Amino acid sequence: MKFFALFIYRPVATILLSVAITLCGILGFRMLPVAPLPQVDFPVIIVSASLPGASPETMASSVATPLERSLGRIAGVSEMTSSSSLGSTRIILQFDFDRDINGAARDVQAAINAAQSLLPSGMPSRPTYRKANPSDAPIMILTLTSDTYSQGELYDFASTQLAPTISQIDGVGDVDVGGSSLPAVRVGLNPQALFNQGVSLDDVRTAVSNANVRKPQGALEDGTHRWQIQTNDELKTAAEYQPLIIHYNNGGAVRLGDVATVTDSVQDVRNAGMTNAKPAILLMIRKLPEANIIQTVDSIRAKLPELQETIPAAIDLQIAQDRSPTIRASLEEVEQTLIISVALVILVVFLFLRSGRATIIPAVSVPVSLIGTFAAMYLCGFSLNNLSLMALTIATGFVVDDAIVVLENIARHLEAGMKPLQAALQGTREVGFTVLSMSLSLVAVFLPLLLMGGLPGRLLREFAVTLSVAIGISLLVSLTLTPMMCGWMLKASKPREQKRLRGFGRMLVALQQGYGKSLKWVLNHTRLVGVVLLGTIALNIWLYISIPKTFFPEQDTGVLMGGIQADQSISFQAMRGKLQDFMKIIRDDPAVDNVTGFTGGSRVNSGMMFITLKPRDERSETAQQIIDRLRVKLAKEPGANLFLMAVQDIRVGGRQSNASYQYTLLSDDLAALREWEPKIRKKLATLPELADVNSDQQDNGAEMNLVYDRDTMARLGIDVQAANSLLNNAFGQRQISTIYQPMNQYKVVMEVDPRYTQDISALEKMFVINNEGKAIPLSYFAKWQPANAPLSVNHQGLSAASTISFNLPTGKSLSDASAAIDRAMTQLGVPSTVRGSFAGTAQVFQETMNSQVILIIAAIATVYIVLGILYESYVHPLTILSTLPSAGVGALLALELFNAPFSLIALIGIMLLIGIVKKNAIMMVDFALEAQRHGNLTPQEAIFQACLLRFRPIMMTTLAALFGALPLVLSGGDGSELRQPLGITIVGGLVMSQLLTLYTTPVVYLFFDRLRLRFSRKPKQTVTE
């Protein structure tokens, strides 16, 4: 009591304490970073290696495997996957959450160094690594277009000037330049001209390489001067290479231009990028795992004017895609929802107390509690994101509850004629323990969340801590500022004023009287209520088992990603046409604002598209509805598929795929994997629970298989090395020399001119110069025939792997899909040599599913322990927790009604309900125990009186929590997909709980009291202390 009096009788100190809390909160708010969600990115590092011209199988065995063995020894690697395609290998390392990305990078570099001696000697450069997740959508895409400069020149500006500068910006993890390649001098050989002149391809390669040499020449000096020696040993342009003498035939010089077309072109002609309908170079910017997306985007935008000045005016630099506007809009929506919630809960107080002065008190205490929370959020390193702001929105109902309980009890004493200061002290003393019990037991709900590991634990931790801090500050404010303001602002009510009840007041009295009558009937029919209570428990179990489940609600971020997968034998020219056709279909859709895409590189039959939708207020459909509409139009394109998926703020794993969810097949027997993967994929494609089923296994590419006749080769004086060198020179876009420029290094690329490689007959024109100087056609010692070959070879760990990706059709959940996949695998009878498991987000969903029930039980157990300690009783906590089954039924029924699957957000709602609905029982039990102790009432009289006496604060706190959550249900706009499941769960649970617990709690209280008396050694003792 002295504690309360200290603040009630020292108003200046109490006000200044509240002002200090508020100022600290305002300061913290101004310094808090902004993000879509809490920081939950896994540390991911990509290791890349190249060997131009090498087949996928060669890359996998000679490059990927040695690197994997070395990288696999690094501590903290949770997953290692690799993909090897024509001339390139990429290994993706995903680390544990607690692994420092910089320390991991040092270990990766050491592992690369250790494996270097095992790698092929012909690699043009050492393997490199980048700290970025390739499966993440870019946070920003910049495009370069020009009517003056070529694509190669644009690429040069992008990779040489723009990308390095952008990479230095804080938060940027990777800048991927696509749409073309660096400028190069291309030597397109004419096989017939070479044969006529008796010049081999190796002769051309050697001549070009020897003609362009950059070596130190030294210096001359005498007694007084020194001269640096400089020669014209370098050739820079196609015009300089064209007259190069490469051979003498019968005394005549054979120049490079006589046997080849030499052009200033690009390093790899099989690349194309577009923005809308225009050729473009794309700069796809991804953030570091620990970086804040808003701060990073703002830093890039601030740098753009400076970047524009570094490139010619004829080049147009534009932002094609920016992830930040929808994130900002989503956060603005949450902030508006928070303000509306505060206004609604204050309205509840006014309606019940019908006093402007009394309403001012929660109107002050609620903002103080919420604003003060920002200071703690800053100290904890949190951000302003959808979950933390949703926590504050929900907290409005909690923090006002504490103020309501104190305020209502003080108001009750004032209505009885007590003086304000005395009423404030007496009223606070009576409910101080109640408020403490409600707050501590509510915080206890979140203890299991704080101890939860993995991605779900990291995701929910910020929500739980934010809400717990708000409750803690609210507890302090409710026991200090609220009673002080009541004592100095409120006035004692006169008896005649108490009789003037109109409007809402009269309705409340009528409700209370009706409740009293119905409660008498219920207390005389306790068995029926017991049956209802047991029924709700059974219904909870059935609803939880049957409700569709997913990991995280599908978000509409306004951005779509598309993966193009064409026939495995498609040419680059045809693939570029497919990209243009798909982009036209997408661009013509009225909901699309911008579309960019690219194709080429090591995987000719694939491409990527990035689609920006119009803002939510300019379109009526959701992202998923737009995807469903486009899917029908895109299906009409023959020879290729475009798989669309909505970009999400959370994407688990480092695998790049054409759909949102992955199912991975592993085997140590590559033949078994190649046999069963098509069977499994075709079976999954028939399931109605899955859409857009596709696979990264591409083992049906067209190949021309050459078989050497080694005996003939030996007789003709030709070795395998010379034959393979011929093929690499002719068809491998072989980099034969380097051109050094001040800003970059460029390549001289040699191949047979594409005009002579339009069909298989090109092989017949190839020849090798033997050791006698004779031209021997390839057909003399080799035979060839068409065959199938893999376009890529994939590993997970050191096992062969294939990942099947899928999306969810409208109306289907991830639990439906995972159950259907499990059934399909069982029906197919897949052998034990082929192992299947979910990956990425689907894997985390499986892990979360297994822990959800344990988490709920742990929360209930924690609350029971806290209540047992507070009440020094084993029984009363059970009475209080008996309110939970009805809340669970209401929450699950509401989700079913709104066709919302049970997600991680809904789980938060269930956890919150555990804390919310028990408040009603705490208020009833507290006053019933007090009445038994000091009023000499029977248990039935005590609980009946407690129910009637606490009816008004119970209704106030429930409606406050309900109105606090209602804006989440009704909110639209950006980010509503995250807010609505939480609001639906809470509102549904509160409505059902309020209808039932007003009756079930008294019955359970009496049941346990009778049970206690039956087993008590002292039957005359009324209350368990």
Swiss-Prot record:
Transmembrane annotation, as ranges: 7-29, 336-353, 360-379, 389-411, 431-453, 468-490, 853-875, 895-917, 948-970, 985-1007
**Cysteines joined through disulfide linkages:** none
Where does the record place it? Cell inner membrane
Expression induction: The mdtABC operon is transcriptionally activated by BaeR.
Q: What is its main location?
A: membrane
What Pfam families does its record include?
ACR_tran
SUPFAM superfamilies according to UniProt: Multidrug efflux transporter AcrB pore domain, PN1, PN2, PC1 and PC2 subdomains, Multidrug efflux transporter AcrB TolC docking domain, DN and DC subdomains, Multidrug efflux transporter AcrB transmembrane domain
How this chain assembles, per its entry, is: Part of a tripartite efflux system composed of MdtA, MdtB and MdtC. MdtC forms a heteromultimer with MdtB.
What domain of life does the UniProt record list for this protein's source? Bacteria
What is the organism field in this record? Escherichia coli (strain K12)
What does the entry list under GO cellular component? efflux pump complex; periplasmic side of plasma membrane; plasma membrane
User: Can you tell me which family this protein belongs to?
Assistant: Belongs to the resistance-nodulation-cell division (RND) (TC 2.A.6) family. MdtC subfamily.
What this protein is called in its record is Multidrug resistance protein MdtC
Q: Which InterPro entries match?
A: AcrB_DN_DC_subdom (IPR027463), Acrflvin-R (IPR001036), Multidrug-R_MdtC (IPR023931)
A Gene Ontology annotation in the biological process aspect, one of them, is:
xenobiotic detoxification by transmembrane export across the cell outer membrane
> Transferase: present as a keyword of the record?
no
- Gene from which the chain derives: mdtC
Which keywords does this Swiss-Prot/TrEMBL entry list?
A: Cell inner membrane, Cell membrane, Membrane, Transmembrane, Transmembrane helix, Transport
Q: Do you know which Gene3D superfamilies this protein is assigned to? A: Multidrug efflux transporter AcrB pore domain (3.30.70.1440), Multidrug efflux transporter AcrB pore domain like (3.30.70.1320), Multidrug efflux transporter AcrB TolC docking domain, DN and DC subdomains (3.30.2090.10), Multidrug efflux transporter AcrB transmembrane domain (1.20.1640.10)
Keyword Transmembrane helix annotated = yes
Describe the function of this protein: The MdtABC tripartite complex confers resistance against novobiocin and deoxycholate. MdtABC requires TolC for its function.
Provide the membrane topology annotation.
Multi-pass membrane protein
Q: Name one GO molecular function term.
A: xenobiotic transmembrane transporter activity
